[in-house]
Curated annotation (Swiss-Prot):
InterPro entries: CobS. One of its GO terms (biological process) is cobalamin biosynthetic process. Belongs to the CobS family. The lineage of its organism: Archaea, Methanobacteriati, Methanobacteriota, Thermococci, Thermococcales. Joins adenosylcobinamide-GDP and alpha-ribazole to generate adenosylcobalamin (Ado-cobalamin). Also synthesizes adenosylcobalamin 5'-phosphate from adenosylcobinamide-GDP and alpha-ribazole 5'-phosphate. Keywords: Cell membrane, Cobalamin biosynthesis, Magnesium, Membrane, Transferase, Transmembrane, Transmembrane helix. The gene is cobS. It comes from Pyrococcus horikoshii (strain ATCC 700860 / DSM 12428 / JCM 9974 / NBRC 100139 / OT-3). This is Adenosylcobinamide-GDP ribazoletransferase. Its cofactor is Mg(2+). It comes from the Archaea. It is a multi-pass membrane protein.
């Protein structure tokens, strides 16, 4: 899976672009690499732990998905036909909707991380990466970018292996603490973002998949917060 890591993280290793297409099954496994540092910060309960944990997460994964969320939100909020929405999403300038979406996602994550178990960030990242895989499984690319290139290579075997890895990582956490089962709802929040993308744009590109990743992560943290506090 070393070839897929450079596409989803800032971990300084070299990956082969063509080989990465054959490692899409490893998307859920990437959460094992992206969540330990923020989880450790939360576990140690250092001052401003939730802020530092989130900063460490984005230091690890980069800001590409967050940028995609901003572009996605701009496209979603534009009134008009599909062409206008796609044009707004591809505009290099970030609009008010994009800024609002990014700020909202960041604030919800910071707030939620103060109220959930330290390992909740792992569940959130696991759901986030699996939701990206499910988004690509729609096989409805928008344009001919990286998203389309990966979708073309995603077959049933890769999807099956990715699902098995997701379950192998997810189930032990649920067995250890059944209340964490509520986190599964976060995955459906991400899938709803996929539906919104298809309804508005007719397909998915890298921005859409990045938005799905961000929305799934924050959605998972929010539902875990509600599950543990109600």
């Amino acid at each position: 899976m070393k070839n897929i890591l450079p596409f989803l993280t800032r971990i300084p290793i070299k990956g082969d672009f063509e080989k990465a297409r054959r490692e899409l099954w490893a998307f859920p496994l990437v959460s094992v690499f992206t969540s330990p540092l923020p989880a450790l910060i939360l576990y140690l309960k250092v001052p401003l732990a939730s802020i530092l944990a989130l900063l460490s997460l984005y230091f690890t994964i980069g800001l590409l998905h967050l940028d995609g969320l901003a572009d996605w939100a701009d496209g979603i909020m534009v009134k008009g036909d599909r062409e206008k929405k796609i044009k707004a999403m591809k505009d290099i300038n970030v609009g008010v909707a994009g800024i609002f979406a990014v700020v909202t996602v960041l604030m919800l994550q910071i707030y939620s991380l103060q109220l959930v178990p330290f390992y909740a960030i792992f569940l959130a990242e696991l759901n986030s990466k699996f939701a990206m895989l499910l988004a690509m499984a729609t096989k409805k690319p928008l344009g001919k970018g990286l998203g389309a290139y990966f979708m073309e290579a995603l077959d049933r075997n890769q999807l099956l292996y990715g699902t098995l890895i997701y379950l192998l990582l997810y189930i032990p956490v649920i067995i250890a603490e059944p209340r964490n089962l509520v986190s599964f709802l976060g995955l459906f929040i991400g899938l709803y973002a996929v539906k919104i993308s298809l309804d508005n744009f007719g397909g998915l590109n890298g921005d859409c998949i990045g938005a799905v990743a961000e929305i799934t992560r924050v959605g998972t943290l929010v539902v875990i917060t509600l599950g543990w506090r109600i």
